[in-house]
Amino acid sequence: MTVKKIALVAHDRMKKELIEWIKKHQNLLKHHELYATGSTGQAIEKTLNVTVTKMESGPLGGDLQLGVKIVNKEIDILIFFWDPLEAQPHDPDVRALLRIAVVWNLPVACNASTADYLLTSPLFDSDYHPETPDYEAYRNRII
């Protein structure tokens, strides 16, 4: 089994759903490196009795801290249960996190069913590395 670096994020109204999903997959998740934003990380530690690398709370910059880890290829999977029914004070940060995950072709799940697919994929147990898009032309463009 290859140890994955998994980022887990949930908006306040979605934390209960994420924790229920984590309980369902706790035997698998506890063997991986887990990262989370503030209070989500605390709830995960309590649920799994494992150490979680915790960032700041999302509104205090935690989403952006995870985004930096994605750019630096320090995260393998992002599981983000975001609240589709309520605007967040840090919506620009949420959008930035999701955008940067797509920019770097990171597997992302935004709900329990998609997260189930990620964890049960045959690629999950492999040394899978998503293709990194080639941005050299963009980096070298003349403005």
UniProtKB/Swiss-Prot annotation:
PROSITE patterns: METHYLGLYOXAL_SYNTH, MGS. The keyword Cytoplasm does not apply. It catalyses: dihydroxyacetone phosphate = methylglyoxal + phosphate. Substrate binds at residues 11, 15, 37-40, 57-58, 90. GO terms for biological process: methylglyoxal biosynthetic process. One of its GO terms (molecular function) is methylglyoxal synthase activity. Its EC number is 4.2.3.3. Keywords: Lyase. This is Methylglyoxal synthase. The lineage of its organism: Bacteria, Pseudomonadati, Pseudomonadota, Gammaproteobacteria, Legionellales. The gene is mgsA.
